């Protein structure tokens, strides 16, 4: 865990700071170990429930990466058991959780900043429909790009990514 964040921290070459958060204390400990192993000095990991607003972070982030919990339907090659475990009601619960998290973390983006929404699923409800829901409820954002990658397209896992920009209002 933390691989994308570590990569971003390295690309910043010390010119910025990366704060990565996860609700799981165990995952945070793994991220901290990876930070040490990669000798990244401009990154910290914190245990935090993304549904809970951090008042001190509102309007301060140039970029928020919302890499949200999802059904994982884009990684069936690696985890084929998902198709047997995942039920329609599970996906509905995940969509509700994703929306709750988005409703909180978007506040951290400063005007002119960006929010990256990503999942490792190919489910439209968790992807395009969530972005449409978010845009209908947060007019201060605009979609800059949105892409669904299917597993057979690049020979990789399936995933979704949308880049949203907070307008200067």
Model-derived regions: residue spans:
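S-adenosylmethionine
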Residues: 1-169
């Amino acid at each position: 865990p933390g691989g994308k964040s570590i990569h971003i921290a390295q690309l910043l070459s010390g010119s910025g700071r990366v704060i990565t958060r996860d609700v799981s204390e165990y995952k945070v400990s793994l991220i901290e170990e990876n930070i040490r192993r990669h000798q990244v000095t401009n990154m910290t990991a914190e245990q935090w429930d993304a549904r809970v607003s951090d008042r001190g972070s509102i309007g301060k982030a140039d970029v928020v990466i919302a890499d949200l919990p999802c059904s994982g339907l884009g990684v069936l090659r690696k985890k084929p058991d998902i198709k047997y475990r995942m039920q329609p009601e599970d996906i509905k619960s995940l969509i509700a959780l994703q929306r709750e998290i988005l409703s909180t973390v978007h506040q951290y983006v400063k005007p002119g900043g960006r929010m990256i929404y990503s999942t490792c699923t190919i489910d439209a409800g968790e992807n395009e429909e969530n972005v449409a829901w978010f845009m209908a409820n947060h007019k201060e954002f605009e979609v800059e790009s949105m892409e669904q990658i299917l597993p057979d397209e690049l020979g990789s896992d399936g995933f979704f990514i949308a880049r949203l920009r907070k307008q200067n209002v």
